[in-house]
Amino acid sequence: MFNTHKVEIEWGGRPLTLETGKIARQADGAVLATYGETVVLATVVSAKEPKPGQDFFPLTVNYQEKTYAAGKIPGGYFKREGRPSENETLVSRLIDRPIRPLFVEGYKNDTQVVLTVVQHDLENNPDVLSMVAASAALTISGVPFMGPIGGARVGYINGEYVLNPNIDEMPESKLDLVVAGTADAVLMVESEAQELSEEVMLGAVVFGQKGFQPVIDAIIKLAEVAAKEPRDFQPEDLSDLEAKMLAVVENDLRDAYKITEKQARYVAVDAAKAKAKAHFFPEGVEEPEFSAEKFATVFKHLQAKIVRWNILDTGSRIDGRDLKTVRAIVSEVGLLPRTHGSALFTRGETQAIVVATLGTGEDEQMIDALTGTYKESFMLHYNFPPYSVGETGRMGSPGRREVGHGKLAWRAIHPMLPAADQFPYTIRSVSEITESNGSSSMATVCGTSLALMDAGVPLARPVAGIAMGLIKEGERFAVLSDILGDEDHLGDMDFKVAGTDNGITALQMDIKIDGITEEIMKVALEQAKGGRVHILGEMAKALSTSREELGEFAPRIEVMNIPTDKIRDVIGSGGKVIREIVEKTGAKINIEDDGTVKIASSNGKEIEAAKKWIHSIVAEPEVGEIYEGTVVKTADFGAFVNFFGPRDGLVHISQLASDRVAKTTDVVKEGQKVWVKLMGFDERGKVRLSMKVVDQETGKEVVAEKKAEADAE
């Protein structure tokens, strides 16, 4: 019934298996990939024909994690998987980025790649495995995909590169880098690092590329026995139309791309496009020689050619800068004084307002992952409203791009944050992109660094980011610093680097062409370093280090530790005690399983009151110490005094006063405040207190007072 084919290799110390022919046989391509005991099903379906009038390639990558893969049942009311999580969105983008450039140009059939994690061994991360599975499924599907690609994760532990470190090894690694590419070229890099040098980062990319070569060989081996017949698709030759259009609008486009202001430039480009449209689609002609879709494709190609020729021939860019110059930067902090921290970062025509907010442990984000539930105390959210590029558009929940850009900025900032025991706050940073002309994610990095320092978050060092570009024709190439939006769209590489003056904290690279050599990447990294240092210098004009005090409106948090066996006493039956503390003092209290207690309030007196209350519950009274207490009950033989939190003790009638006492109520009454000295404990552990050895007015020991008076005489 099944015509199965399987390839197995040893990869990074674990078996990798690629199997097809048994599951999802109606898809164009389907591969079940296993690494260790983590299993991913990859399927590919591509429409037989493109939709009429479609002028783009509708590729969708959906990565989904099923909770049954880890032996779990989903939380929530409906008990089933819902909308994609942030991680699922990020992994979908991670796979989309290296495969999209490898589809034959001009292919516009609706294509969907679905990756389903069906088993997770809690050791091997399924993201890279899903990338490999997607590559294998595409390679055998028959769609015009110029792969295969491979992918690998690279760690850096004890000064050594590690191929595909498992989940338990990652906390020890100074690097989390995922690289993907073909046998000859790197196509995509995504990473977070702890201030590593350019040499170490480049070495990791090269190490990863070599590491995934066996995977590419395995996919080719599978395709040799299982691939479907390639689809009969030939990209249309539009060179004649391109030559005709170039003759009509070349001068207009060259003039347009000499205009440095974005909106004015777009007006000039639109005028050139209208001129070409009038030439090729004259009024009265019902059947032009080519379609509107072909016209749009060719005009876009011409735009790219004009920009690329100008840069390679003259070294001058769209806005008049040379290759290395960063646009003018203006930084401002304290923009919104009632927020906890804020910054306005403007670089050319790209601008971000970033606001930092500090919260308590109650504000941490609870993340329910396949590997377990954990809390995240640092959140960074990136918003890209349509007005930032002078357009109208959809508003609402964040799209994939916004999630991805926010996570890149998160990776850049995260290594510089203080440890939780040094700064016990939950941090949320929100970046509102108010203008955009390229590199808004790196503006978010710079703005977030400034806003956090303005809020008093003790960053180890300021962080800045820069986006690099590449124009390559044959052997000629130009690396561009701080690229514009047009240079991103029309160029061959988008290379974002963020870090401090000590090293790189995040790197993201997307390459659209083959032939990006190690030498080109080295040039780009070194040029990015110079740009990053320059940007840090410009940021320092606004604020060079974190403020020593928190903002006026930020909550204060103090941390104390209590014995774990006392946690139940502080919480009380059904939370009765801790609720009373919160209600009476006004402070927020968070108690962790290890006995760490975080007390938060904007009022210092409330924090002190809560600390004192908790201390009275968990601390043990010391023999010989004097305490203030309240009489809670009287009896013939003495008085019971509440003197240490919830602790009561007996003052025997003989210890009430120096003179003989006939009746307890002659000396004290219930509710009366008294001073007592802890004399000790009886054989049953009961507390023995004394009032007569303490001056009830001063709270000082009587014997000590008399001795002091004698010494004075």
Curated annotation (Swiss-Prot):
Its EC number is 2.7.7.8. The keyword Nuclease does not apply. GO terms for cellular component: cytosol. Mg(2+) binds at residues 488, 494. InterPro entries: ExoRNase_PH_dom1 (IPR001247), ExoRNase_PH_dom2 (IPR015847), ExoRNase_PH_dom2_sf (IPR036345), KH_dom (IPR004087), KH_dom_type_1 (IPR004088), KH_dom_type_1_sf (IPR036612), NA-bd_OB-fold (IPR012340), PNPase (IPR012162). Residues 555-614 form the KH domain. Keywords: Cytoplasm, Magnesium, Metal-binding, Nucleotidyltransferase, RNA-binding, Transferase. PROSITE patterns: KH_TYPE_1, S1. One of its GO terms (molecular function) is polyribonucleotide nucleotidyltransferase activity. Signal peptide: none annotated. Its cofactor is Mg(2+). It comes from the Bacteria. SMART domains: KH (SM00322), S1 (SM00316). Residues 624-692 form the S1 motif domain. Pfam families: KH_1 (PF00013), PNPase (PF03726), RNase_PH (PF01138), RNase_PH_C (PF03725), S1 (PF00575). It catalyses: RNA(n+1) + phosphate = RNA(n) + a ribonucleoside 5'-diphosphate. Gene3D superfamilies: GHMP Kinase, N-terminal domain, K Homology domain, type 1, Nucleic acid-binding proteins. It is found in: Cytoplasm. GO terms for biological process: mRNA catabolic process; RNA processing. Belongs to the polyribonucleotide nucleotidyltransferase family. Involved in mRNA degradation. Catalyzes the phosphorolysis of single-stranded polyribonucleotides processively in the 3'- to 5'-direction. This is Polyribonucleotide nucleotidyltransferase.
